[in-house]
């Protein structure tokens, strides 16, 4: 792989104000990882971005939590089709939100089906987030809560489990299921199952002061296109860690992606790899993310015109992308404009991390698309 094209496009992006700094990593077909870092850690932090700069990766957490859950399934400690409520009493009797009465109070009914781990890992449980569901947001506001205080177990379903696809807190709840199955915190369980074996020493739910000293600053995109520093998101509560709580580096995250595209890296079992790479939603389809909190996220319509499905943990493109990933590749993203793909057919993967809101910033998405094409061209 020739480094210069990727380095040049990242340098140009920073010069154009896409981000104060960008960091990226590429997994090559031979398994080597190439790293890139350009610019500064933040608009108010002149320290240079480098491969050791750490990022809040938000929903990039989901694939790792999913892989750990599938490993526990392979070891007989979890069951994809067991009702989650047997281990998590908060979902023992799930309810479906049918609307709101004249006074604005939620109208709920008992769900006819139980929520399963299969539902949680494929976003077919009926659970949403507040930022992409006006109904969930209204429910929380009526209760005087936010997602952080309610957690994944404090939400109603929007539909019967398995009925359709909706991006939500399912994998956050799966993190609680991992804790129930192992008797350990999610961080301890992931360290044992994933981080330790893969040498991911820069990935954590609980950053220390020394770790935070290497952290990239978080920013908000202003109406004039400029970026303004904002406060870092504090560590998420346990209910929401499995879907969005990790901090990491592109290099560390690439170690996980390398295991996904290179046969498990001696860590992920064949059964886990099969689950991560097989679409589970072809009957119900995969929807778009329509934001109701524009300060957090724009609408997200990945790969328009491309046939897609959702595996356990990943979005999967059923068609090849021109100049980029092969059919059957896997991808997702994190709220502060962190993006990645993993191409098992080519043994290639890439991660590009920024730290800005709202999510799905078209400027960063344009760079990510160019980054992917540059990787395959070189």
Q: Where are the predicted features?
A:
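A conserved acidic, glycine/proline-rich C-terminal tail/linker
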Residues: 325-329
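Short, well-ordered beta-strand elements
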Residues: 36, 339-341, 347-356
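Generic C-terminus detector
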Residues: 356-378
């Amino acid at each position: 792989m020739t480094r210069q094209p990727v380095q040049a496009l990242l340098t140009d992006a920073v010069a154009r104000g896409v981000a104060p700094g960008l960091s990226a990593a590429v997994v090559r077909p031979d398994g080597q990882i190439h790293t890139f870092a350009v610019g500064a850690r933040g608009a108010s932090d002149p320290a240079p971005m480098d491969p050791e700069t750490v990022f809040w990766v938000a929903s990039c957490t989901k694939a790792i939590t999913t892989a750990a859950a599938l490993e526990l399934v392979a070891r007989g400690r979890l069951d994809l089709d067991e009702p989650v409520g047997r281990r998590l009493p908060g979902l023992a009797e799930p309810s479906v939100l049918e609307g709101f009465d004249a006074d604005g109070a939620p109208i709920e009914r008992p769900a006819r089906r139980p929520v399963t781990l299969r539902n949680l890992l494929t976003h077919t449980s009926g659970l949403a987030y507040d930022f992409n569901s006006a109904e969930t947001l209204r429910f929380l506001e009526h209760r005087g809560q936010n997602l952080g205080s309610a957690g994944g177990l404090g939400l109603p379903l929007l539909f019967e489990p398995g009925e359709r696809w909706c991006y939500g807190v399912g994998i956050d709840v799966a993190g609680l299921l991992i804790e129930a199955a192992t008797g350990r915190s999610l961080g301890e369980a992931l360290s044992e199952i994933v981080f330790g074996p893969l040498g991911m020493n820069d990935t954590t739910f609980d950053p220390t002061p020394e770790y935070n000293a290497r952290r990239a600053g978080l920013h908000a995109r202003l109406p004039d296109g400029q970026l303004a520093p904002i406060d870092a998101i504090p560590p998420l509560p346990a209910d929401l860690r499995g879907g969005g709580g990790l901090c990491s580096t592109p290099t560390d995250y690439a170690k996980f992606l390398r295991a996904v595209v290179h046969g498990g890296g001696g860590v992920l079992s064949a059964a886990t790899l099969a689950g991560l790479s097989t679409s589970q939603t072809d009957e119900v389809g995969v929807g778009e993310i329509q934001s109701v909190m524009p300060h957090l996220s724009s609408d997200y319509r990945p790969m328009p015109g491309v046939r897609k499905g959702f595996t356990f943990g990943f979005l999967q493109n059923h068609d090849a992308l021109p100049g980029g990933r092969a059919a059957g590749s896997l991808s997702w993203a994190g709220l502060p404009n962190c993006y990645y793909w993993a191409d098992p057919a080519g043994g290639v993967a890439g991660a590009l991390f920024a730290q800005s809101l709202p999510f799905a910033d078209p400027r960063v998405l344009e760079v990510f698309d160019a980054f992917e094409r540059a990787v395959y061209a070189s």
